[in-house]
């Protein structure tokens, strides 16, 4: 959507993750008074410094008490050390005291974007916890981020500023709830693929900070809007496999995984979900592609960037090829699978294809 807006092309976006929608809305809001943002930034910094001056930053017990005040259940104490967390909380309070509306959202987004750098969280590519950072220059990180945002906002043209870019929170499997049928010329997406990645973890701190997900139940609500791509995102009521159960190529994959599980004597709860995950993934993608077909204009195209996978008992899953079969069954024509790049597996010493699948209505 950002590229579309830069090119003057109207766009819509749908995402299941509350924070990703919030982030997109901030990045696409270019009707901003930069002078007012600069002035508000100075007021926020002054308010922050006044509050920080009243804290004994060497009193570890006092810092711990401040850090734990109103701590969300989902914010594990290992994720961010007490001192940086207290600074983040002071900065958020300063933003809330000095701003409102769209201006406030912009500054809260700036804080969200510095959470990972000042925290102990790391990605490799999965969610992990690194060496604790006892302190971090939160204020400088915030100042630098806002200054960068202002530089970008001052560079846009009036045409770019006026170009429509709408991002909605929703489930792509119900796309016609948000987008009119036969209204879209081109769709571009990089959906989940069956690699056992739990996608809410990639924005866990941000979801907690913004209050979108503060406990297991609220995270589960978000995950249920997502395509099933992880064994931690499978539910009893899932039933979309019915859309693809008669596709022999998918059954070959699940049969091979099942055979290897039995051969290895696999008994863990997650391993028992492997084949269900594959069925629900391709079923969910079938539901999504069906909806995409409805909103595309005749001759319109959808482009999907997906990776192959070896995540389940080393069985090779050719994601783009299988989705091509699914798409053609739904009525798409002129399918193409184009190699985007070869990428290194993060858990094994080999390369995987990352392909672009192009389908036409």
Predicted regions, residues:
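Class I S-adenosyl-L-methionine-dependent methyltransferase module
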Residues: 6, 10-158, 200-271
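Acceptor-substrate binding/catalytic loop of class I
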Residues: 70-79, 272-283, 306, 310-321
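Conserved SAM-binding strand-loop segment of SAM-dependent methyltransferases
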Residues: 161-174
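A short acidic, Gly/Pro-enriched loop at the edge of an enzyme's catalytic core
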Residues: 176-188, 196
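A short glycine-rich, Lys/Arg-flanked "PGG" loop and its adjoining helix->strand segment in the class I
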Residues: 283-298
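Short alpha-helix
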Residues: 288, 318-331
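Core SAM-dependent methyltransferase catalytic element
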Residues: 297, 349-361
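Conserved S-adenosyl-L-methionine
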Residues: 332-342
């Amino acid at each position: 959507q950002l590229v579309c807006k830069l090119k003057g092309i109207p766009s819509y976006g749908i995402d299941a993750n509350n924070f990703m929608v919030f982030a997109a809305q901030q990045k696409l809001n270019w009707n901003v008074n930069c002078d007012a943002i600069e002035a508000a930034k100075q007021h926020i910094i002054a308010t922050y410094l006044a509050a920080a001056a009243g804290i004994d930053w060497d009193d570890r017990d006092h810092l711990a008490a401040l850090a734990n005040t109103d701590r969300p259940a989902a914010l594990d104490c290992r994720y961010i050390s007490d001192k940086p967390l207290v600074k983040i909380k002071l900065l958020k309070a300063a933003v809330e005291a000095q701003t409102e509306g769209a201006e406030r959202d912009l500054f809260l987004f700036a804080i969200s974007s510095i959470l990972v750098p000042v925290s102990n969280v790391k990605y490799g590519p999965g969610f992990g916890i690194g060496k604790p950072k006892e302190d971090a220059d939160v204020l400088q990180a915030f100042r630098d981020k806002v200054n960068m945002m202002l530089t970008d906002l001052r560079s846009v043209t009036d045409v770019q500023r006026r170009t429509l870019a709408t991002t909605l929170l929703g489930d792509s499997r119900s796309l016609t709830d948000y987008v009119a049928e036969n209204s879209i010329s081109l769709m571009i997406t990089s959906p989940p693929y069956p690699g056992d990645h739990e996608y809410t973890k990639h924005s866990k701190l941000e979801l907690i900070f913004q209050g979108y997900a503060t406990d297991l139940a609220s995270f589960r609500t978000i995950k249920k809007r997502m395509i099933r791509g992880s064994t931690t995102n499978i539910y009893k009521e899932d039933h979309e496999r019915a859309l693809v159960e008669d596709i022999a190529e998918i059954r070959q994959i699940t049969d091979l995984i099942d055979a290897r599980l039995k051969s290895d004597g696999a008994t863990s709860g997650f391993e028992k979900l492997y084949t269900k995950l594959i069925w629900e993934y391709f079923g969910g993608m079938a539901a999504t592609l069906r909806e995409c077909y409805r909103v595309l204009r005749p001759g319109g195209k959808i482009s999907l960037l997906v990776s192959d996978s070896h995540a389940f008992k080393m069985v090779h899953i050719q994601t783009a090829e299988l989705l091509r079969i699914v798409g053609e069954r739904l009525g798409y024509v002129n399918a193409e699978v184009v190699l985007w790049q070869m990428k290194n597996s993060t858990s094994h010493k080999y390369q995987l294809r990352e392909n672009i699948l192009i389908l036409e209505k």
